[in-house]
Amino acid sequence: MSSAPNGRKNRPRTAGTIFQIGGKAPSRESERRESSEALLAVSDCRMVVQEFNTLVALYRELVISIGEISADCPSLRAEMHKTRTKGCEMARTAHQNLSAISGPEDGEIHPEICRLFIQLQCCLEMYLTEMLKSVCLLGSLQLHRKGKHYLGATKLDSRKEDSSDIPILEDTSSTPPDCPHTYFLVATDIENIERDMTEMKNLLSKLRETMPLPLKNQDDSSLLNLAPYPMVRQRKRRFFGLCCLVSS
């Protein structure tokens, strides 16, 4: 062992010092892993919200189609039921995913998560509006069909009272033979839509309760101007290509 110029002996580096320095690497690695997992969770949640957005737009188109017809269309009602069922499922999944990644209520929150919360809220509100429209249109279609059936029966009775010996042929082109069954099917659809509306209203209430604190403390106008934290008002920019437009 060599001696130092001042008479002290040089001691070799201990293994503890080496391991202590090397111990910081796993910490940085775990931070990178957590950050990557968080980004992946946000990306998955974004895809679910966009899928729900697309289903809301599709359901809206189907509701518009109801207003353009004057007779019952079983295939259209079946497509509406399929789209509505999947839409409710995607809404529940989106809410669960957002609640899982939102973090502590009073902590900092990524602006992308804020936008997803707002977009999901807007989509749910529009979804409820379109379901209410579909209930009104299906109900008016029922009344229209019943009115035509009643008028047809009245005309037939008045023609039967005629003393003429000419045989009367009943016009059944406008009234399907299974009217009572059709009434029952449409009424069942209306009940199912109202049930889904109740579920989505409850989900919307839960979403507003689980929103991060920065979103709860702002009014609707400031939510539309949401920007990266710290939240400040900026010029509105619209993102096109979606059913629910969210400004940032």
Curated annotation (Swiss-Prot):
Statement: the UniProt record of this protein carries the keyword S-adenosyl-L-methionine: no
Post-translational modification, as annotated: Palmitoylated. Undergoes rapid palmitoylation turnover. Palmitoylation regulates the cell membrane and nuclear shuttling and the regulation of GPCR signaling. Upon depalmitoylation, it is targeted from the plasma membrane into the nucleus. GPCR signaling inhibits depalmitoylation and promotes localization to the plasma membrane.
Keywords: Cell membrane, Cytoplasm, Lipoprotein, Membrane, Nucleus, Palmitate, Signal transduction inhibitor
GO CC annotation, single: plasma membrane
Cellular localisation: Nucleus; Cytoplasm; Cell membrane
Keyword Cytoplasm: yes
Lipidation (S-palmitoyl cysteine): C243, C244
Its membrane topology: Lipid-anchor
One BP term from GO: negative regulation of signal transduction
Region described as Disordered: 1-32
Function per UniProt: Regulator of G protein-coupled receptor (GPCR) signaling. Regulatory subunit of the R7-Gbeta5 complexes that acts by controlling the subcellular location of the R7-Gbeta5 complexes. When palmitoylated, it targets the R7-Gbeta5 complexes to the plasma membrane, leading to inhibit G protein alpha subunits. When it is unpalmitoylated, the R7-Gbeta5 complexes undergo a nuclear/cytoplasmic shuttling.
Family: Belongs to the RGS7BP/RGS9BP family.
Protein's UniProt name: Regulator of G-protein signaling 7-binding protein A
Species of provenance: Danio rerio (Zebrafish)
